[in-house]
């Protein structure tokens, strides 16, 4: 045999249990026996063994027996038939001298049955002469069964080996797949980590820039608020100062107007006291001449003022503008009043702001005419 027998498989044990002989008699529990009965049984067993060795009788399988062996007893006792042994008791004993166990069990049962009958002698007929051939057939059948069982065992072992190989192959393939999947997952995780790192770096830079931009915006907003407040304050200050300037100019114009009115009244009184009447034509000519002279003087003064402006401070330029506006107001206020006075009475002369002694000249001219 190439391989050692590893034992029955589960299927074989199940099959043996199913094919168990249904006619196997149940063993009776041995009852307590006396000393004499034990001695008798021993004697019967020895006698049966001697007879079995001499005759070479062996037990056969129940299906191989044509008829059960008949045993005869003396005339003193009625005959009794020995029970047929099942196939399980036909196996040879592995220890001893090659005697079958069926022969030993049969005398024991006979001894148990005959122990109740007393001291009667038992005579067993010798078996048939074909027992040796039948024994050989049984051995051949047992050998064939043994070989069949070994072949089945070998087939089962080969199947188990193939199954183990298939399982090992499947496990190796699964392990390779799992390793490949783990490698893919690791690579994907690395790529995701790299993307996360890039995004986090970009986000950090953008956040720093946003923080700096928010600080700059807050500073610019503060400056804008301050500038807006200053602009509003300056605008209010300008409006207030312009109102003050307008009020002052109006007040100056009213003062000049009142002064001119007083002068006109004074001149009228003087003319009435002297009984002097002025011609309207001469007065108109003198007024036109004075206007032309005044315009020429103003035009001659303008380039001088333009040349002097870059060297003048801001306060002087403001005072010059204020003086110009006052002059314009004076001219606007005086010119219509003088026209009215000339229309009403020809004795009122034209007063020029550039000629402080104009009143005396006018009076002397009026007296000369």
Swiss-Prot record:
GO biological process, any: hair follicle morphogenesis
Coiled coil: 145-297
Region: Disordered, residue numbers: 1-128, 334-369
Domain of life: Eukaryota
Pfam families: Transcrip_act
Keyword Cytoplasm: yes
Biased composition (Polar residues): 46-61, 82-93, 342-361
Self-association and partners: Interacts with SCYL1. Interacts with RCHY1 and RAB6A/RAB6.
Disease affiliated with this protein: Geroderma osteodysplasticum: A rare autosomal recessive disorder characterized by lax, wrinkled skin, joint laxity and a typical face with a prematurely aged appearance. Skeletal signs include severe osteoporosis leading to frequent fractures, malar and mandibular hypoplasia and a variable degree of growth retardation.
Record-stated family: Belongs to the GORAB family.
Name assigned to this protein: RAB6-interacting golgin
Provenance organism: Homo sapiens
